[in-house]
Curated annotation (Swiss-Prot):
Lineage: Eukaryota, Viridiplantae, Streptophyta, Embryophyta, Tracheophyta
SUPFAM superfamilies documented for this protein: Ricin B-like lectins
Record-annotated Ricin B-type lectin domain positions: 194-340
Organism: Oryza sativa subsp. japonica (Rice)
Protein name as catalogued: Ricin B-like lectin R40G2
Superkingdom of origin organism: Eukaryota
Gene: R40G2
GO molecular function, one term: carbohydrate binding
Amino acid sequence: MFGFGHHHNQAPAAPSDPNQIFKIFCRANENYCLTVRDSAVVLAPVNPKDEHQHWFKDMRFSTKVKDGEGMPAFALVNKATGLAVKHSLGQSHPVKLVPFNPEYEDASVLWTESKDVGKGFRCIRMVNNTRLNLDAFHGDKDHGGVRDGTTVVLWEWCKGDNQSWKILPWGPEAHSSSPGAATACTIGGVPVHTVRVFSAAGEDYCLTVRNGTACLAPKNPRDDYQHWIKDMRHSNKIRDEEGYPAFALVNKVTGEAIKHSTGQGHPVKLVPYNPEYQDESVLWTESKDVGKGFRCIRMVNNIYLNFDAFHGDKDHGGIHDGTEIVLWKWCEGDNQRWKILPW
């Protein structure tokens, strides 16, 4: 995009802390930040407390993956959703969001920053096509500027302020005081955030372990039994029939993994987790988006059986403290739609 001979331009410094959170904004209006809304990447008025505006700049592939100008690759992973920004279909198409698999080198979620294009701003472009850049669609002055909900697309470089970006750490005003906010564990020496798991039928109830069973309980960040590790170590080689990567859900306190039940209507089980052993009975996948960012969680080897908050639908009275998790065929119920998000 800027021609050859720019390898001497310094790349932005990599974050020293993998858990550091960033804000992303463009020169067209620095009072609007990149966020996730209704499963789309848009701009919204800056709000340090809105975790949908918090991003991880994941540099784990930066030493071996670089663009044509030698700039290091990174992924942009949303803190609230765990989704990564993915390349669009081409120029003028909105960028996409997909579940981030930190163990799999997927070029379609990798980006680089250009040299400085003025006042510290840089282009953010596809690692394998530096001619296509993040673009706040119609965010230039001629089209009325950035507004709440401006879509982010890819576009060739037009020297627009709506194509010039900064990725900067949030200040202390963005850091939540909630006890679980910074909870992290390590998998293979890599820091990973614990996650919470909840359904669309009752977002104030989280998956927990109680008396040897997996059930739902009122959300409590202080309750470590509600903290789970989404272990993706087998995802490179194990996928479901739709191509989605497999993962295990391991409880932080008990070290137990959620295991497939004996069939429809039966509760899921908990078993000791052996991370070195490839056991498909503890592996799950997430479906495509089934509405507002929720997804089905289903057996890796039988995607027709899904997590189901038993009798958690409105017709049966909804979610309550102690609602059991069973497997059930897809009935389009809110009690079958789930999110797995960082605490």
